Amino acid sequence: MATKDEVLTALDDVEDPELKLSIVELGLVYDVRFESKEGKEHAEVDMTLTSPGCPAAAEIMAAAHRAALNAVESVHINLVWSPRWDPKIHASEDARMDMGIWD
């Protein structure tokens, strides 16, 4: 059975096409949960985007789905808007530095 860390590692390969940073480093992936669905290992991934009007939403969601399938048999990507993404709170220190956000 896959672990949350394995799914996050797979998702780390997905980049925001505008920021050129990993969706995991940006803190866009909020949660990964597991369940058995029809005898298959299934993951539910809660993630958000940098903004509700993100022009690359479909591209990012599809890339996240494909990447997660490298770790689990079945996955559903849930697009959530709560909590609202804030790079000062959700992004890693390295991602904040790359975006020029200095605390």
Predicted regions and their residues:
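Domain-level signature for proteins that mediate thiol-based redox and metal-cofactor handling
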Residues: 1-103
